[in-house]
Amino acid sequence: MITERQNEILNLIIDLFTQTHEPVGSKALQASIETSSATIRNEMAKLEKLGLLEKAHTSSGRMPSPAGFKYFVEHSLSLDSVDESDIYQLVKAFDFEAFRLEDILAKASQVLADMTHYSVAILDVEPSHQKLTAFDIVQLSNHDALAVLNLDESKPQTVQFAIPKNFLTRDLVKIKEIVDERLLGRNLMDVHYKLRTEIPQILQKYFTVTDNVLDLFEYIFRELFQESIFVSGKVNALEYAGLDTYQFLNNEQHLAFTIRQGMSENEMATVQVADSNEPALANLSLLTYKFLIPYRGFGLLSLIGPIDMNYRRNVSLINVMGRILAIKLRDYYRYLNSNHYEVN
């Protein structure tokens, strides 16, 4: 731990540096700290020895090191009031009637990326925490049909598919009966397991040839096991990081996995400063916030940017965005009221 005065100096240097991105000298600190310039320089030298400050190559000033930013986040970061113009911009962005969950989450991701000039990823409820609560097949013609799947009693999804050759209407009815009996009410982890174990054996009782039926099950259910993730500001990564990070952000399933790995089940928020095991994010900061999705669970909101970002503003922004999302999603699910299908 550092002394109270050293902590005050470190916090002030970080505040000034994140505003100007210029090295900070002792004279710039004197107006806020009641002590001599020599004492401030001495304390700055001690902070440098501790690895919390770094010398600038082009001036006599100091700038925070990655360790300094990390210390600040762990010991001094608090939620300040958000700028009124930021609050207005966040609230104004959601002044629209939403007809799909995806529209709300994609909008939140884009708004934050535009306001911060960094990258933002928003994750829906983790697939393994969702349940299959309803299933139906609607035959559209002699050649195609529509599978309607409902998750958590409030997230309908549809999958249109070509009816396999030699299939009769009663075969589609049998598939629905099998799903209702074996998969309905199960969480998606159980559904995935049963599709690999029980279902192939059951199909042998009712179908002479099962390969195309298994392929149909795979096609209908495969997207349920994928993370639902909305990423904005990918191109911004070329400015604050580089090509490796930009390419990594395009691998959205891996990105979702990395974000979840950085947050434990019991945490509501985390700030990782140069602390990711993923090489493309190792020298960056990730601010992740868990927000409520009414009736279903929690989603994750993650801001990815440089180590020298303005933590006070950005942490406050994602905190406010999380609250706005919870309100908007509550209104959305009240409207949905389990009476509407989402058609992709």
Curated annotation (Swiss-Prot):
The keyword Repressor applies. One of its GO terms (biological process) is negative regulation of DNA-templated transcription. GO terms for molecular function: DNA binding. The keyword Repressor applies. It holds the Pfam family HrcA. InterPro entries: GAF-like_dom_sf (IPR029016), HrcA (IPR002571), HrcA_C (IPR021153), WH-like_DNA-bd_sf (IPR036388), WH_DNA-bd_sf (IPR036390), WHTH_HrcA_DNA-bd (IPR005104), WHTH_transcript_rep_HrcA_IDD (IPR023120). Keywords: Repressor, Stress response, Transcription, Transcription regulation. PANTHER family: HEAT-INDUCIBLE TRANSCRIPTION REPRESSOR HRCA. Belongs to the HrcA family. Negative regulator of class I heat shock genes (grpE-dnaK-dnaJ and groELS operons). Prevents heat-shock induction of these operons. This is Heat-inducible transcription repressor HrcA.
